[in-house]
Amino acid sequence: MNHMQKVWICGANGRVGRKMTELLENTPVELLLTDIDAVDITDSKAVRDYAGMNRPHFIVNCAGLTDVAACEENKEEAFKVNALGARNLSVAARMGKARMIQLSTDDVFDGSGQTPYTEFDTPNPQTIYGKSKLAGENFVKEFCNRHIIVRSSWIFGEGSSYFSKIMKLAGEGQTIYAAADQTAVPTGASELAEKIIELMESAPDGLYHVTGQGSCSRYEFAQEIVRLSGSQTEVVPVAAVDDRLTAMRPSYSVLDNMMLRMSGI
């Protein structure tokens, strides 16, 4: 990135926000790092005031309500954070001629497919989380013509709730029950952060799927986490309805990074 460009990362204390910060902090860019305590993205005036005062060249929205169960329990809060927040940031980006980067999810698909979803497949979310994130995508497209939307899946790394839960149970030697009928692509937060930065720098505006390589079930993912931990803890495959560590998600939400391949990124 060019010297003195300003990058505003909203949700800077989250998994992806932290990794982006680590990757950019020793570069010539000026980082503007906020979380809800500094700027509440659901407050349109606070967002406009901060953007107007700091005039970022990029606004990266890593903030969001990502707890799927919590979204189901509080629909209004989910849409307020994931949709209205994205709208507020998009409006600020348009007003300041900044480029808007929106992080989204595989949950925008219904899981009924049997082949990986591309950027050209029609979303049909079944959860409040997925619906609120899709609404956020639509607001970004409506209010800011200079935008990149990044969909990813099963993001793991420092602070990952599922990863941490499995590691904790493995450390305690407790039997782990994991869904064998939920399949997607685990994606490292570091890998995702690197690709987002690359897209910010050189990619045309639009929608991109960005995931790791190779799909697996929650059960297989848990098995690999336990293996890496060195634990001998038993991992038992169960149906998603019996998996207490994760909320209901699409049964199949493997993303195909088609636009990355076609764009040579």
List each language-model region with its residue ranges:
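Mid/C-terminal beta-alpha module of Rossmann-like enzyme folds, strongest
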Residues: 195-196, 202-247, 251
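Catalytic helix-loop patch of NAD(P)-dependent Rossmann-fold dehydrogenases
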Residues: 80, 84-88, 108-150, 155
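N-terminal Rossmann NAD(P)H-binding glycine-rich loop of SDR-like oxidoreductase domains
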Residues: 6-24
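NAD(P)H-binding glycine-rich loop region in Rossmannoid oxidoreductase-like domains
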Residues: 44-81
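C-terminal amphipathic/interface module of NAD(P)-dependent oxidoreductases
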Residues: 251-265
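NAD(P)-dependent short-chain dehydrogenase/reductase
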Residues: 138-184, 189-191, 197
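NAD(P)-cofactor binding segment of oxidoreductase domains
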Residues: 73-101
